[in-house]
Amino acid sequence: MFTEICGKLRTCIYKKVAFSRPLGCNLRQLPVFRDFHNSVSCLRENDKALDELNATILRLQRRIDASKSISLQQKQTQEFPRNEKLLSFLLDNTLRSNVSDKETHSVPPKSKSVLPSEDNILVQRLGVPETSFNKYFQLEPTAESISHKSVLAPEVWKSRLDNLFRYSVPFEKCNLNQVIELVTHLPSSFRASYAKNILDCLKQVCLTPSVYLLNILLHASAKHSTLEETLNVYNAYNQFQLKPDNYTFVSLIIAYSLHKQIVKAFSLLSEMKRLKIEANTHVFNTYIAILYHERLYEQAWRLFDYMKFKSLQSQPDDKTYSYMISVCTAERKVEKALNLYQEMQERPINPLTPSSRTIDAILRALARYPRYHSKFWSIFEELRAEQWKPGAQTFVAFAQLFSYGGQVNSLKRWISRIWSMSGETPDAKTIELLFQYLFRAYSNVKFNQEPSLEQVPNEKTGDDASISSPSNQLSLKLPFLLSSSSGDITKEELIHEAKECYHYLQQYHPTVLSVHLRTTYMSIFKNHGCMDEVKEFYAKSFRPAKLPSSHVVSNQNETTCNKDLPFRDIHVYACAINGASVSNDFAFGYAVWLEYLHCKSYLPEVLNGDKIEFEITKSMIILFARNQFLHLAVKLLNETKDRHWKWTRRSLGIMHKVAFLSQDKPALDLIEEIVLD
């Protein structure tokens, strides 16, 4: 009888305490379990105590039954999904996801009828009326609440957090669950700015944070705070005697990489080894992402091979293959990207099904090169037959496809569809991206070839008719929707259309006219040999590169209009010099090059800056050679031969021809010395 009663009591205590235990707390560590085990020896030979214990069990059972009935009523009225693993979701009316996306954490119930009034003390101190708690914190399990998006404006959040931390003991009478709930609803930037306050307040009331809470604060600090502030949050793990996990180190890796300390980011592997934490796939994926963004492709491949052939706990997943396909795209190795896409599906152990992330990566890789466009359509048709649903990045892949292929008509219809999809004007970032692709398509149109077969997936005549109808209010805001989208386009019509699109942006969306978008627009004239338009646009749509104030000569005649223009960057200079080289306009090209040399050391750093500088040098050598300034070409080549650029016979072909015709032996010897066989 004793064993049976003890078993019943243990079960009741588990059921009773499991609803209210703090996050990360082991049930056996609770006082009720310690008291239970300490009292077992006293109960073995005491019949009266056994009777009292049996009565206690009955009372506990009645309370559990009452709790079950309340939970059942809430479930019937709110229609939550039935899943025993999400018991906290059913009881608490909200879903909390760990950063690992694999664990769920229970939090206290939120309805006023369940929580005692003193449990809402954090809400009161924030200055939020208790009846409006759901409104401000999105306690209903919507998609936004699951992703921790806040409905409050930043200034409102700051005001309410100031109200909270104005108290002498802000977290007095609060438990850890309530603090975690507050932090998960904070915008990421506020988690970072108030991380120190939150940790200090936890120490003030002797509350030990969980690793989950510290990971949230550390991840936000890594993205929004200084490196010193991030490391201060990391020190809290030692202060509270908590062991970091893989996701702790992912945040530290991100922090070091954002502050350009790549070596320190990789040295964290030694720290993980010291703490006996085995790096998982998520950690290595973060490293590969850093190597990809830093253009350290060889190291990314070495790490990928380690994951494949040596590591047992960090096998490549779908995200790993997505990054490596992007690496192949950056290296212009499309065949290798296709091999990876095939490998992940056919590997003998644990084959992977491509997700939208991987599919979009391979489609973007194929879209950049017209010779692979047939393969693009082949993969897309296979996916469409399998009822695959494209995502937002798939629209970008199609825009790239039409843009790099110079398929203007298809791209116009595609942009029209995206534009009218939501029934309202897209945001500025989307508009800039769409017109970036459109201007590139205008640049890539080839007039002296047979027209390619332009196709748009799921194209319906009815949809196009509704989009291009003059009665459609959106269509009146797009200059190309009312124009014909069939038949070949002439060079004059293309230039006219491009100018209309640019004037449309000037009138309706002037804020999207960035330096990058203006440069792409200027490349339309450059690629089609319209150097007069290039010169005019170069002079009127940019200002010379920004110099330090000590190098600037004040110009009283500079108008307010000119002050609103963007400064030229290396992309602008490269586009203008390349255009001058192709059209052999020495006066314009040489003037732009001199301005570039004057401003070169003050230009902002850009991605692939060394590659762009190489293109500028090649264009100027061609321009010098064509205009019989061979000594200037030799001088420029001598000055840059230590840059480890890959010179070929083709890139120096014109210079070699001029040197050969003029029998300039030093120039010929220099070319032979520098050219890679």
Swiss-Prot record:
InterPro entries: Pentatricopeptide_rpt, TPR-like_helical_dom_sf. This is Mitochondrial 15S rRNA processing factor ppr3. GO terms for cellular component: mitochondrion. Keywords: Mitochondrion, mRNA processing, mRNA splicing, Repeat, Transit peptide. Disulfide bonds: none annotated. Its main location: mitochondrion. Involved in mitochondrial-nuclear incompatibility, a major determinant in reproductive isolation between species, through hybrid incompatibility of Ccm1 and its interacting partner 15S rRNA between yeast species. The keyword Transit peptide applies. PPR repeats lie at residues 210-244, 245-279, 280-314, 317-351, 355-390, 569-604. Signal peptide: none annotated. Belongs to the CCM1 family. It comes from the Eukaryota.
